Amino acid sequence: MSAADLDYFSEDEQREIEAELDTGFKDIEEKYAVTAQKGFETMLVVDNIPIVDGSKKQRLLERLRQTFAKVGAPIEEESIDMPWNAAAGTNKGFVFLTYPDVKEAENAVHTLDGVSFGKNVLHVNRFGDIQRFASMPVGEGDLPSGWKEKEYIEKDYLRNWLGDIAGRDQYVTFWETEVTVWWNGRNGTAEALKGPDGKPVKNSKWGELYLQWSTMGTYLASLHRVGVALWSGPKLDGPIGVNVLRFTHPNVRLIQFSPCENYLVTWSEDPLPNYENHPNAALRDTFGPEDEGNQYVIWDIKTTRVLRTFPGDKSAIGVDDTQSRMSWPTFKWSADDSYIAKCNVGAGISVYELPTMGLLDRKSIKIEGVQDFEWCPMSQKDLIARQEGKGKECVLAFWTPEAQNQPARVNIMAVPSRTILRSKNLFNVSECKFYWQSQGDFLCVKVDRHARKAKSKKATSCNLEIFRMREKDYPVEVLEFKDYVPQFAWEPSGTRFAIVLQAETNLPSVSGASTKYSIDFYQLDSKKGDFIAIKHLDSKMANTLVWSPKGRHIALATIGSSSKYDIEFWDLDFTIDERREAAELGANVTMLGTGEHYGITEIAWDPSGRYIATSASTWRQSPEPGFSIWDFKGQQLLHESRDRFKQFLWRPRPPTLLSKDQIKKVRKELREYSRQFDEEDAAEENRGSAEKLAQRRREIGEWNAWRTRNNDRLAFERENRGKSKAKIDVKGQEARVEEWVEELIDETEELSM
């Protein structure tokens, strides 16, 4: 309506007409609007149904009905409508469900969503929601109101440090509040990690609490009072949400990465409050009312999303002695990140599927009296097979103590089928500990045993129950020891292990006295098929065993003593004969060197197995905080003593991408590669020597130039003042100094009678 048309109306009528025009048809639209949910409140859409042909349609419907009834959302077959693709002769991958009333439909939405159906995971939506989203008034290329489009930022290559030309490893040092990332060079030379500007990479935010690398070295985790930050990329920094990931969990104290770096567990001793009305938006968006009172948070790393939260175990964690009674890690990952499990001591094991975090088969595995469990690791071949859907089931081992007339028992179970693969009865058991070989080939159960009729159940002897996981029926070999075994360690990817033996465990502690141990090395005899002792070391002070990641070399360290800080470096295959296989087992076990690190609290090999680091942390009350780097032969390459030194951490490496054939080829041509590396090392050494010589010559030249300038200036000033250079007579000041040296050649003593 034009302004000319309004001239025929009065001013009041014109105002009413303008108001109606401004309002438009809003009141009419609201009056006659059709709600998308109206009439469809009881109808649901279930997506991700397997695609089948006509011959399997009825069977699929029956299985769907059984699954729905099993999880608590039963429905009649007449109420299931399966759309059909007539051209392809198959279903379309979704079904419509119509329940009798709204209450049952709402129950089905919450019950069925995320349910596993074979290899598929069902997704449930209300039919009205789908209608509403489909009819949203959004133009082409537009976004709904309230949505913000984020600019795409390309992520840096997260494993760029592996491309170092010299093949160097990295490590982190944490001193006071200063954190530095270093390259570990040849002969202990350290070079700080530098950014594109050539300056060392440093971040003041790293040193608030403590640091931890992820399992494959992709992320550096720093703990803060408000949560956890993961840093990645060439500079371990960058845009938030891309190279820097934040996980909000106030007062977090402990974290744990999954083996494949997909998930993260965080724990705080303070239960989560209700953040529904909290002023901090990050806390409101992260946690809901259902998370109140929980202490554990399971995260998806890539999306920084909370998968699930759990309360603390009140039975395992006391109010006054949290640190002494808490067992960490509480949650344990399967090797392929498929499952995460928690031991409910005395009741059972709760296994959760990832990423849905739903209980496996919607119920825990009930195991009366269960005390502990461990997942079986996998070789790279097994992991690839699992990813392709061809691998075997995951495996875990657990143990139950003696109860009434029942013996203690170790069980090996397959997951998800819950099939018991092997059981072994045990007697007079104080405690069991599981030690898996890194490839999952062997499982050693260290059984601490007490005397049969002893009143105290303190362990005085030990059995090693070794299960062979690659053989039929999982045979068990038993090694018995009259002494207590405080330490056990498998050789990575090998068939050898080392143990520490302690003769008497009940001796009173004497001030200044040190406990002596013996150390045994065992190896699988390929001819006899048994594990046999290949070397015995007696009267040793070492109580810690640390194998090289590549096997063969092992370090024996004395940690926790107030008077001894010895380190021994051993080679189990040392020989000058290339045909090592001809030698007897144990004949080549040789000590390469010894060392000492005063106040040592930790020891760790680098991923290459060429270097080993010992550190003394001020957190553990070490008298001389600092760190040292040694080569595998025991030669100390670097030592740094610093007050308030806290952490030394090697950066882990992911598994090699080389196949077995490629590795064999490299080993076959190792001499050629060694010659090339020796030439590069010599060139580097010469370059370093030439640089030092040039620097010294430059410094001497600068000194001589400075001295000449000052002499010329002094002579010029003396001449201007009319003074001549003083002549000093040094002849009169000369003194002759003589030194008499008496040498006793023989001494005779005569006695007069």
UniProtKB/Swiss-Prot annotation:
Entries under InterPro entries matching the protein: EIF3B (IPR011400), Nucleotide-bd_a/b_plait_sf (IPR012677), RBD_domain_sf (IPR035979), RRM_dom (IPR000504), TIF_beta_prop-like (IPR013979), WD40/YVTN_repeat-like_dom_sf (IPR015943)
Organism lineage string: Eukaryota, Fungi, Dikarya, Basidiomycota, Agaricomycotina
Organism encoding this protein: Cryptococcus neoformans var. neoformans serotype D (strain JEC21 / ATCC MYA-565)
GO molecular function, one term: translation initiation factor binding
Described purpose of this protein according to its UniProt entry: RNA-binding component of the eukaryotic translation initiation factor 3 (eIF-3) complex, which is involved in protein synthesis of a specialized repertoire of mRNAs and, together with other initiation factors, stimulates binding of mRNA and methionyl-tRNAi to the 40S ribosome. The eIF-3 complex specifically targets and initiates translation of a subset of mRNAs involved in cell proliferation.
Known partners and oligomeric status: Component of the eukaryotic translation initiation factor 3 (eIF-3) complex.
GO cellular component: a single term: eukaryotic translation initiation factor 3 complex
PANTHER family: EUKARYOTIC TRANSLATION INITIATION FACTOR 3 EIF3 -RELATED (PTHR14068), EUKARYOTIC TRANSLATION INITIATION FACTOR 3 SUBUNIT B (PTHR14068:SF0)
Protein localization: Cytoplasm
Record's keyword terms, sorted: Coiled coil, Cytoplasm, Initiation factor, Protein biosynthesis, Repeat, RNA-binding, WD repeat
Family in the record: Belongs to the eIF-3 subunit B family.
Protein name as it appears in the record: Eukaryotic translation initiation factor 3 subunit B
One example of a Gene Ontology biological process annotation: translational initiation
WD repeats: 142-185, 203-241, 321-362, 537-580, 595-640
